Amino acid sequence: MRLTQMPSEFQKALPVLEKIKEAGFEAYFVGGSVRDALLHSPIHDVDIATSSYPEETKQIFPRTADIGIEHGTVLVLDGDEEYEVTTFRTEDVYVDYRRPSAVSFVRSLEEDLKRRDFTVNAFALDETGEIVDLFHGLEDLEKQVLRAVGVASERFNEDALRIMRGFRFQASLGFALEPETFKAMKTLTPLLEKISVERTFVEFDKLLLAPFWRRGLASMIESQAYDYLPDMASSQDKLNRLFDLETDFTFESSEQAWAALLWALEIENAQSFLKSWKTSRQFAKQVQDLLIILALRENGELSKRDCYRFDIDLLLQAENLRQAQGKEVNPQAITEKYQSLTIHDKKDIQINGGILIKEYGYQPGPDLGEILTEIEFAIVDGELENNREAIHAYLREKK
């Protein structure tokens, strides 16, 4: 099969392929970018595979960088563009179900492609637009099926993260898992405990943010993979609560998706749960803020102080999630209340601790902090104008 129209992302990278070919080596576009081109989906990363070894690749191009040369990858700088060019390779026995004990460079495209996870990710595309399909990936693409390359159990034993990737690809593509592939995934889910939490988080996060997240999550639940994820053992019934969200609902952000997950799981200690997933402090704080906003909304409308406390984006994401839960919402009222605030941060106040110390004799300490907080909330509540004259008058009354 030949692509009738080469996507612009590939056209930009064609000079790289052509230079490698001119040097006497093979070179192809490979991986998910080829699949996305066939599906007419946006292309994000253009990856190139070649029969040239890393040192040979570096001799072909004047500007390169070593970003993973031990795995055969050289970063080629072509004008303003950067391309990862990786040597065809085979992999030895995998250690800890995560990484190969050794990587061997080869000259064979077939040897390289047969180590990949799913047939729809095992395409190669040459400079003429010809598709190399050694594992019937085109047929699977047509049938919308996710099938492991070769023997499924071998692929998942090599890298157990591929189990989560399978659920994630199902969520992003909307494809069905081929029965033997899914059977192997279900059998080998205990291996997920061998995978670093950080890698698992990335795949689970992508699953939740994907357009067909319900399909991926349903397969994950059916496989009982959740039993081997941090703080999620025996959580099937609670995970199913996510399916109570509106049928066509998709998450706006990772923070919103994980807030929904914690809501479904009825997690009491969000901080502990997110720590077990090794998320960043900033991410954990925003997820917890969303949960707080949801709890506040359960008790009625948000106050001015509530709107001041949280970023408008989080306030609206919480309202969006409430709508998906089938609850009454009023994003316009929240937006208007937020916009009516005369300050949105302490830094907006027309006075500071230094002025209070210099002009009013306050000393650094709790009393200073208390009066600043009092001024802050008086402004937020609309009881005090945010200008020096009004604040000075307020302070004189306090004295």
Curated annotation (Swiss-Prot):
<feature type="binding site">
    <location>
        <position position="32"/>
    </location>
    <ligand>
        <name>CTP</name>
    </ligand>
</feature>
<dbReference type="Pfam" id="PF13735">
    <property type="entry name" value="tRNA_NucTran2_2"/>
</dbReference>
<feature type="binding site">
    <location>
        <position position="162"/>
    </location>
    <ligand>
        <name>CTP</name>
    </ligand>
</feature>
<dbReference type="GO" id="GO:0000287">
    <property type="term" value="F:magnesium ion binding"/>
</dbReference>
<dbReference type="GO" id="GO:0004810">
    <property type="term" value="F:CCA tRNA nucleotidyltransferase activity"/>
</dbReference>
<keyword id="KW-0479">Metal-binding</keyword>
<comment type="subunit">
    <text>Homodimer.</text>
</comment>
<keyword id="KW-0067">ATP-binding</keyword>
<keyword id="KW-0460">Magnesium</keyword>
<keyword id="KW-0808">Transferase</keyword>
<feature type="binding site">
    <location>
        <position position="168"/>
    </location>
    <ligand>
        <name>CTP</name>
    </ligand>
</feature>
<dbReference type="InterPro" id="IPR032828">
    <property type="entry name" value="PolyA_RNA-bd"/>
</dbReference>
<feature type="binding site">
    <location>
        <position position="162"/>
    </location>
    <ligand>
        <name>ATP</name>
    </ligand>
</feature>
<feature type="binding site">
    <location>
        <position position="159"/>
    </location>
    <ligand>
        <name>ATP</name>
    </ligand>
</feature>
<keyword id="KW-0548">Nucleotidyltransferase</keyword>
<dbReference type="InterPro" id="IPR002646">
    <property type="entry name" value="PolA_pol_head_dom"/>
</dbReference>
<feature type="binding site">
    <location>
        <position position="47"/>
    </location>
    <ligand>
        <name>Mg(2+)</name>
    </ligand>
</feature>
<dbReference type="GO" id="GO:0005524">
    <property type="term" value="F:ATP binding"/>
</dbReference>
<dbReference type="Pfam" id="PF12627">
    <property type="entry name" value="PolyA_pol_RNAbd"/>
</dbReference>
<protein>
    <recommendedName>
        <fullName>CCA-adding enzyme</fullName>
        <ecNumber>2.7.7.72</ecNumber>
    </recommendedName>
</protein>
<feature type="binding site">
    <location>
        <position position="45"/>
    </location>
    <ligand>
        <name>Mg(2+)</name>
    </ligand>
</feature>
<dbReference type="InterPro" id="IPR032810">
    <property type="entry name" value="CCA-adding_enz_C"/>
</dbReference>
<keyword id="KW-0547">Nucleotide-binding</keyword>
<feature type="binding site">
    <location>
        <position position="116"/>
    </location>
    <ligand>
        <name>ATP</name>
    </ligand>
</feature>
<feature type="binding site">
    <location>
        <position position="116"/>
    </location>
    <ligand>
        <name>CTP</name>
    </ligand>
</feature>
<dbReference type="InterPro" id="IPR023068">
    <property type="entry name" value="CCA-adding_enz_firmicutes"/>
</dbReference>
<comment type="similarity">
    <text>Belongs to the tRNA nucleotidyltransferase/poly(A) polymerase family. Bacterial CCA-adding enzyme type 3 subfamily.</text>
</comment>
<dbReference type="GO" id="GO:0001680">
    <property type="term" value="P:tRNA 3'-terminal CCA addition"/>
</dbReference>
<feature type="binding site">
    <location>
        <position position="168"/>
    </location>
    <ligand>
        <name>ATP</name>
    </ligand>
</feature>
<comment type="function">
    <text>Catalyzes the addition and repair of the essential 3'-terminal CCA sequence in tRNAs without using a nucleic acid template. Adds these three nucleotides in the order of C, C, and A to the tRNA nucleotide-73, using CTP and ATP as substrates and producing inorganic pyrophosphate. tRNA 3'-terminal CCA addition is required both for tRNA processing and repair. Also involved in tRNA surveillance by mediating tandem CCA addition to generate a CCACCA at the 3' terminus of unstable tRNAs. While stable tRNAs receive only 3'-terminal CCA, unstable tRNAs are marked with CCACCA and rapidly degraded.</text>
</comment>
<dbReference type="InterPro" id="IPR050264">
    <property type="entry name" value="Bact_CCA-adding_enz_type3_sf"/>
</dbReference>
<dbReference type="InterPro" id="IPR043519">
    <property type="entry name" value="NT_sf"/>
</dbReference>
<dbReference type="Pfam" id="PF01743">
    <property type="entry name" value="PolyA_pol"/>
</dbReference>
<feature type="binding site">
    <location>
        <position position="35"/>
    </location>
    <ligand>
        <name>ATP</name>
    </ligand>
</feature>
<dbReference type="GO" id="GO:0000049">
    <property type="term" value="F:tRNA binding"/>
</dbReference>
<feature type="binding site">
    <location>
        <position position="165"/>
    </location>
    <ligand>
        <name>CTP</name>
    </ligand>
</feature>
<keyword id="KW-0819">tRNA processing</keyword>
<feature type="binding site">
    <location>
        <position position="35"/>
    </location>
    <ligand>
        <name>CTP</name>
    </ligand>
</feature>
<keyword id="KW-0694">RNA-binding</keyword>
<keyword id="KW-0692">RNA repair</keyword>
<feature type="binding site">
    <location>
        <position position="32"/>
    </location>
    <ligand>
        <name>ATP</name>
    </ligand>
</feature>
<feature type="binding site">
    <location>
        <position position="159"/>
    </location>
    <ligand>
        <name>CTP</name>
    </ligand>
</feature>
